[in-house]
Structures are given as structure tokens and as C-alpha cells.
Amino acid sequence: VVNIPPDLGVVLDVSPPPLRGLNIYGVLRFDRKDLELSADWIMVHGRLEVGTPQEPFRQRAVITLTGNNPEEDQMGMGTKVLGVMGGVLELHGEPRRGWTKLAQSTPRGAREIAVLEASGWRVGDRIVLASTDYDPRQAEVRTIVAISGNTLTLDRPLDFPHFGEVTFGVDQRGEVGLLSRNVVVQGDEASAGSGFGGHIMAMMGSVMRISGVELRRMGQRNRLARYPVHWHLVGEARGQYIKHSSIHESFNRCITIHATSGLEVVGNVAYDAVGHCYFLEDGAETQNLLEGNLGILTRRPEASQGEQPVIPTDKNPATFWITHPANIVRNNVAAGSDGVGFWYALPENPTGPSATTTIWPRRTPLGEFSGNVAHSSWDGLMVDRGPNRDTLEPETTVYNPRTYPADTQNQYNDAVNPPVVAEFKNFTAYKHRGNAIWLRGLNHKVVGARLADNAIGVTFASRATTLEDSLIVGDSANKGFPRNWEFRGADGRSLPRPWASGAGPIQDNFPIRGFEFYDGKVGFRNVEFVNFQPLEIHNAQGAYRTVREAGALSYLRFTSFDIDSRNFAQGARFTNAKAVYLPPRPEPTPEELSKGQSADGYRGSVFIDLDGSVSGRRGHAVVLNHPFLLDTSCEVRPEWNAGVCGHGYARLHIRSESGENIGPVSLTREDGGRPVFRMWGAPNNPRFFGATVIKGRAYTLEASGGLPRRLRLRLEDSEPGDFIHLALPYSGEPYIYRDYWIDNSNRLAQAASRAEFEASSGDRYWSEGGWLYLKLRVKNEVGRDWAVLDVCSSDLCR
């Protein structure tokens, strides 16, 4: 072990023999010549300098970390570590362009590629081409053997085609990253077999500035806090950064920001990493800048390779894992992940060493999310499923940005704690097997999105959320490269769901959708939809053929959860696109019910075509083709499996407040052919039911489990004066209270006659022949959009 004392400055001008360890209390500065330094571990208490920001190192420097005893622990940082313990680490290699894009498409088997900008790249450099298909493993590494302008000759042919065009307005030019740098920090060659690589770690009081550096065989498999580059509990770190560097063949993440704020992570390239790659750890990390970074092939841990998730969500890894919204995430590219491109995984409060109840990420306004690109993953942008504070398992997460995030008492009070709209700007996403965008929460806005070739473009599990000024393409000119076992389109294109299900019918006829309504109130304004048409698909041999359906607009397929009848479309434009497709869904089978798949919400699908840009009928509703939602005045459009109706629609909620299981329940509309809608309840909850109803109509409610002691009926998504009539079988004297006020002064009286009941404002009921007749009517109060009746079998619902 070599110790450099505090009062000594050393210039390294020769490559020393391998060291057991190196403690730098003074200064160690690399001379301007090719040098190698090898040690089990290096600890910087003073200063280690390889180049400076003003004078980058232009020779070749290689630092190899060799520690092989996993039980060794140097100052809490283990071994095989370049650690910074209150010192200064300056690593500055030659400034080089970190990544570019293809200038044109490149076929499989090609040995030449044309890129937008190759200045500064050299023969002998290693580069990585990102996948431009659904499979992130179509990324491939090559070595440059010749350069002519912006044309690169590679050492061997490409195994996959790589797309290089702007197609239908969506930029799908594949990224090409430079892996080679002249300053290298690496784990030794044994790291490749053991997964026990090197790592760089800065502790509190340290300063770390890295630029133009190559990190390879770094990170330590399955080990917490052992990542290629890691700011650990540093706190305020303005002026510190990692820029224009490369990280590849990482056994555990890429760049970790842990309880550290003010960092700059700019222009880096990361390739082939296990677990979340660009990683903000606890949820207390703020004011960090992530700009112009590229991440290619973010892998889930493979148990067969001895890999385990460090935290539970590594099983679904994100190229960018963001745990606090108050950061700047700008112009980055997530180019292929087994999980997610950009995941805002917000905990309720920070976790781990940062745990506190004074910080509320789920209610903090968004810093910036703009100009980012995601492709070749399952999901592109995910704002949901943040870590549970105790288990770190993903949980349903509502992102509700507020002016005062810590005001827990008024988190939904707009007057006292005004919302702050979170704008996700100019996002490009293509080739996702799931969603390009999935948001959960309220007061979100997606503006300027450009999406293509996704199973689903946009789903908002939200309210007060809109998509605006955007473009969504179903099938683009990027046809990809189906594997020989995959189903594919008749035109040869790869599919987001290319596999067969065990039951026989292939999963690929899962219809692609552009904008998917769910929850609500949500909608879109000024959005263009292109190329949403049915597509014949077949297996590789062509023996099995079917049709994959498509619709620019749809609903979350077969959801059992509640929806909002005010969901809306405005300013839609369609080019070669079926405007709507709502897949048929009959009543659930016993097997589906055993899995909580009632599809109650989906079977009530409705949205409002505000300006007629979808249906040609301004202000009309588009509803699922179900008799309960239609009457003879509606226009049924079979190719949509939907009807266009001029009625107003609302939602009726039916709840057993006294806890009895009453399901399934049925509603019969008392007109026409008396159509019936049966409900089995929200998943595994036979006490709460929801149905889409036509305003002003009469319905009969029957519960197979009998009526509960206290039944709550709520009409919502309405306006003052809206009503429905409701009849239900009832014996005995009812105690009925209006709008949540359970008091005898608010108990409904029985009308003197059926006519008086019909004409009432909702403050009377009628009983006759074993039937109870109710009128759910919204009071004439500004802003009121609901009406409630509690029907009880005893005084004051006791």
C-alpha cells in the first residue's frame, strides 16, 4: 500500500507495478504521457488529477481496479474502488463528440454506415448502434476500420438493420454512441466473469469532476452502493459533474446520484448496464441537470447469470430513474430497455438514508422534462408505480403537483393549495411494446409529443390531464426486423406483441391504439393521427393468419375500474386512420371474474366529441356499441364497434356503505327494449359498482345479493339540473338522506303523489307496490356536478 502524505505533491511519470492500495492525502498528478495505474483500491483524501477542465489529458491513461476480495471494506466503500473521501477527483480526457445519429437507414449485413456527424472519431474507435426496433438487444458494437467524411467502415457486417429516417414526422434516426476514450477507468479482466467490477464513489465533502472518460467493467453485481460512478450523500454539489463520458459493460447501473443536488450529468453514453441506469436514488435529489445523455440496452437482472435486483424495481429497469420531479431532464435518449425509458418513480417521502417527512415528491412541481426521446423498450415515459417507503416495491402513485407540497391537509384543495400543471414537452417515443406514455395523477399536460409504432400511444390514468399539439403514428416506414419465431405484418413489419398465446389465438391481434381514454376527466386537443388501419399478420411460415386491429382512439382495454363520462376529444385530424376502435367485450366469464376482470368500466366506454372532429357530430358522444348505451337515435358505426349519440351521459355509482356484498347488480333502462347492464364491481369488490347512464332516463336497479342496510347512490359527471330516475325493490320504511348530510332535517319526505315526485327537485321519493322510486338530481349550484342519496333501513343510517 502506497501512501502519499498531505504535504507532498507527486507527478506520476512512469507506470508503476500493480499496487495493493493507494492512499492519496496529498496530490497525485498524471504527467502528460501514456500511463497505466493498477491497484486493488485507490482512496483520495487529497487530490487525484488526470488532466484539468482547462487542459484535458490528451495522452492515454488507464486506471485498473483489481481488488478481488468482496469482504474487504475500505472506509465503507468496499474494494476495487476509486474512492473520494473528502478529497478532489479530477478526470478529464480529450473532448470528443459522444454520440450522433444515422444519416440514412442501414440494411442488415452492411459494413458501412452514414452518420450525421463523425468529426473527431477515429479508426480503431469502438462504437455502438442502438436498436431501432422493439427488441433492445438489436443494439450492436463495432470497431471503425475506415472513415471517409461522415461514412464509417466497420470491422464486420451488421446483424440487424438500423433505421435512419424521419418517418411521417417522427424522428427515428438511430443513435450511434462512441465508447472509446483516451482516459479509462476499468475493472480488471476478471471482472467480466465474476461481475465484481470497479467503482467510483464520492462521499460527503468530496469534489468529483469527470469528463471525457471511459468506464468499463464497472459496478459490482447484486451489491448496493457499488455503481460505476456514484455521488453518495454528498449534499450540495454545484460545480461537480460527469460529462461526455462513456460507461459500458456495467454490472450494476451507470450513474448514481444519491442524496446529492446540483450535479450536471451531460452528454454521456451508457451501454449494456444491469438495473436502472441513470439513477436518482432516494427521492431527495433535486436541482440536478441531466441533459443530452444516451442510454442503450438497460437490462433486467438475469438469475441464470447470477444477477439479482438490488432494489425490487430493477426487475423492470429504467434507463432514467427519477425519484424527485424537481430536476431538469432535457434532450436525453433512452434507446432500449427491458423496462422503461424514463420512469418518474416518486416515493411519498424520500427513502433510505434520506428518509424524512418534510419532502413530498408526489406533490412537488415538475422541474423540466423536455426534448427527450425513448424507443425500443416496453414503456417510454412512466409517471406511476413509485417505490413504497418500506418495501421499495412499486405501488400505485398519484403525481399531484401543488404550490405547497408539504400541505397534506389541502393536497386536493385547489383554492388553498393551487395545482401546478406539470408539462411534459416535446417527447418523442417509438417502438414500445406497451405505452409510449403512461401518466397517473392530476394536472398534467403533454405538449408537442411525436409518437410512432407503439402498442399504445398515450394512456392517462389521471384527471385534469391533456395531450396537446401532438402527432401519433400507428405504423411508420420503420418496419423493423422480426425474428424468425415472431409473428409479423403481411408487409413484413415487426409487431409490438409478436408472440402467440398458449390458448391459440395470437396475442398480436391486440389492437394498436393512439390515444387511450381511461379514468378522467382527460382528453386531447389538436392531435394528428396517422396510419391506424387493420393489418393482416401471420407467423413466419405464413400458416396462421389473422388481423391486428387498430384505432386512433380507444379505451383502456377491458378495464374494470371506473371512468369519466366527460372524457373528451377536440381538434382531431386523421390521415389513413380509423378514428375509433373499441374491441367487443361480452359479459365476463367465471374465469375472468376469478381474476377480477369484470370489465365494468370498459363496457361503459364513452367520450365527448367536442367539436365534431372525430365523428362529424359536434358535441355528440361516442359510446361502445352496447344496447344499454344506445337508442334508435344513435348512429352505429360497425367498423368502430361504437355508436355516435346526441345524448348527455353521466356516471352512476352504487355502493354498499354498510359492507354487505350485493353483487352482481343490474340496471335496466326503462325505455325501448329495456336493455340491461350487469356489473360485478371494481376488481374483487362486490360492494362498489359503476355504470354509464343517459341523463334524464329512468332505470331499475336490482342486486342479486339483496340491498344493503345502507345504500349510497351517486350521480356524477353532470351539471346542475341533470337527473335520472331510479327504481329499486324495497320493503319497509326507507330513511333517505341527500348529498351526504345525514340528519333528520335533511331526510327526504314521501311525495303526496307520483306526479309530485316526478316534478320534484330531487327532495321527494315515491313508494308503491314494493318499489322505491328515487330522483337523483344535481342541485342548481354553480360548480356542482354530482348528486347523492343515502338509502338506509334505519333512522340516521345507524
Where are these regions (language model features)?
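Extracellular beta-sheet-rich ligand-binding/adhesion modules
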Residues: 1-80, 86-94, 98-103, 107-123, ...
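Short, exposed beta-strand/loop patches in secreted or surface proteins that constitute
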Residues: 2, 100-107, 143-146, 754-767
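Extracellular beta-helix/beta-solenoid repeat scaffolds
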Residues: 2-101, 121, 125-135, 139-142, ...
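Solvent-exposed loop/turn tips at the surfaces of repeat/solenoid architectures
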Residues: 22, 27, 33, 40-42, ...
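Acidic/polar low-complexity surface segments
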Residues: 51-79, 95-103, 179-193, 215-240, ...
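A generic structural motif
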Residues: 111-116, 144-162, 768-777
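C-terminal, active-site-flanking charged/polar segments
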Residues: 143-160, 361-378, 390, 394-406, ...
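C-terminal accessory/interaction regions of large nucleic acid-associated machines
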Residues: 469-476, 482-798
